Amino acid sequence: METLAAIGRWLSKQHVVTWCVSRDDELWCANAFYVYDQDTVAFYLLSDEHTRHGQMTGERAKVAGTVNGQPKTVALIRGVQFKGEIRRLSGDEEARMRQRYVKRFPVARMLSAPVWEIRPDEIKFTDNTLGFGKKLHWRRDAGAEQA
């Protein structure tokens, strides 16, 4: 679980996720501020269901995406690529995650957009601070692995 812990520590320090969905052979990507939960290994975000990506997602969809910093040198590149599923939350689950989201991003109190969960099944973390091209891999069905 050391790999997942390293990935989680880095993701908890970031705040913007890019995710992409597909429907009827059409792809679309979006960006959002997120809260990362290390226990569920999931991103939580707010996004309007009437947007192009919201309509393409529906209640649940396959998703792929990235989180990356903006380093000034190649030696400092760090970033995550993932694939998994995105779903719209409801009820107590939505209320609980909205409260956590608003705590991190207080301006979100003004938004009525639904809360979504991105649950990665696979994560690849590139971390050049550990050596050029160093990759850490995690799969939900396999636990932690390193490559």
From Swiss-Prot:
InterPro entries per UniProt: Split_barrel_FMN-bd (IPR012349), UPF0306 (IPR011194)
Superkingdom assignment: Bacteria
Family: Belongs to the UPF0306 family.
NCBIfam families: PRK03467.1
Protein name: UPF0306 protein KPK_0562
Native source species: Klebsiella pneumoniae (strain 342)
